[in-house]
Design a protein with these regions (language model features):
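Domain-level signature for soluble enzymes in the chorismate/prephenate branch of the shikimate pathway
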Residues: 3-369
Length: 369
């Protein structure tokens, strides 16, 4: 027992000595302008160190141990660089408040869509909004300057992420500048005089249908048909004039299209909510913004994601959300999206972003809000 304690104490002493060397390495790299992370050099070191072991178990253990030591050493060097004033500016213009005067806002869907409700909640009832057919159209409109802001659903508390909009954040150089959470209460609506027993087909957005699966389990004779928007389903029921059709949308849609609510709040989760993001083509943020969204690609190897997330852990940063999406041109490889608390001026955030930027294949700042 004593021998083990003695060895552990010696390991701690040597580890402290190893970290002291990191300071000198950082000073050298600051002077020469070299990057902290040199993958080729580290791989060579790991191969040389593992060759000192005489069995595979020890080889793996040595690689794991020294990967961690090197990772911690890099984090120390990132911190020292920040302390020396070497900071990567993110080039977001800070403002006291976003400029909504004469702003044109675009949302996907038709009159009565939840996106329209989110828009009016965030920008005000009398905001200058208009609709397009698809989320991609909305992103295109702010890219070309036709609109100043777009309102896009990004995540539902029951059905999960809106994957297409995560992909659009990567495809376009547009930025998240705000968010709005809207309570989602789905109503089943049909033509005036219709009853649930008349209904044979229900239309709605795929996520809305998913969120109301319990209702369909109780009405197995009803066919589900996906359409591009919840409010569009209400418009379709009105336009088709077929008493056997119903739509799932907000009660506001029923009022707009003159439909009758057959049953209210049919979603599985009575606390159902959707988070919408406000997107702009400008790299702008409110001065009090305290949430940052990023995405990054990692090397396709064991432990790569852990090493990226370790930058948040070591710097005491609270992650709020993490999602993954497949990379379209790389089979079985993924891009990761992370929301976390903090500001670009925070030392901890600067350290974490420096580490991820150096060690990831790619990093994109999606916005701060």
């Amino acid at each position: 027992m004593y021998k083990r304690q003695e060895i552990d104490s010696e390991i701690v002493r040597l580890y402290k000595e190893r970290m002291d060397i990191s300071k000198h390495v950082a000073e050298y790299k600051i002077t020469t302008g070299k990057k902290v992370f040199d993958k080729t050099r580290e791989d060579e070191k790991l191969e040389k160190l593992s060759s000192l072991a005489d069995d595979e178990f020890l080889k793996h253990g040595i690689v794991e141990l020294f990967e961690q030591i090197m990772s911690t050493s890099r984090k120390k060097q990132y911190q020292l660089m920040t302390e020396h004033g070497i900071v990567e500016k993110e080039n977001f213009t800070e403002v006291d408040s976003l400029d909504f005067s004469n702003a044109r806002i675009v949302f996907q869907g038709v009159e009565g869509a939840y996106s329209q409700l989110a828009m009016k909640t965030y920008f005000g009832e009398n905001c200058n909004g208009y609709n397009v057919d698809s989320w991609k159209d909305a992103m295109e409109d702010i890219k070309c300057g036709k609109a100043d802001y777009a309102v896009l659903p990004i995540e539902n508390s029951s059905a999960g992420i809106v994957s297409e909009n995560y992909d659009l954040l990567v495809e376009y150089d547009n930025y998240i500048v705000g968010e709005q959470i809207i309570r989602i209460d789905h109503s089943l609506m049909g033509l005036p005089g219709a009853k649930i027993s008349d209904i044979r087909t229900v239309y709605s957005h795929p996520q809305a249908l998913m969120q109301c699966s319990d209702f369909f389990d109780e009405h197995k004779d009803i066919n589900q048909v996906a359409v591009r928007n919840t409010a569009f389903s209400a418009k379709k029921v009105k336009d088709d004039g077929d008493i056997t059709q119903a739509g799932i949308a907000s009660h506001i849609s029923a009022d707009i299209y003159g439909l009758q609510v057959l049953e209210s709040r049919i979603q599985n989760n009575k606390n159902n909510a959707t988070r919408f993001i406000i997107v702009s083509a400008k790299r702008v943020c409110r001065r009090d913004a305290d949430r940052i969204s990023i995405c990054f690609e990692t090397p396709h190897k064991s432990g790569a994601l852990y090493h990226m997330l370790a930058h948040f852990i070591y710097n005491g940063i609270n992650m709020l959300n993490i999602q993954s999406r497949p990379i379209s041109d790389k089979a079985w490889e993924y891009r990761f999206f992370v929301d976390f608390e903090g500001r670009f001026t925070d030392t901890a955030v600067q350290n974490a972003l420096r580490g991820i930027r150096e060690e990831a294949i790619a990093l994109k700042i999606l916005g701060t809000y």
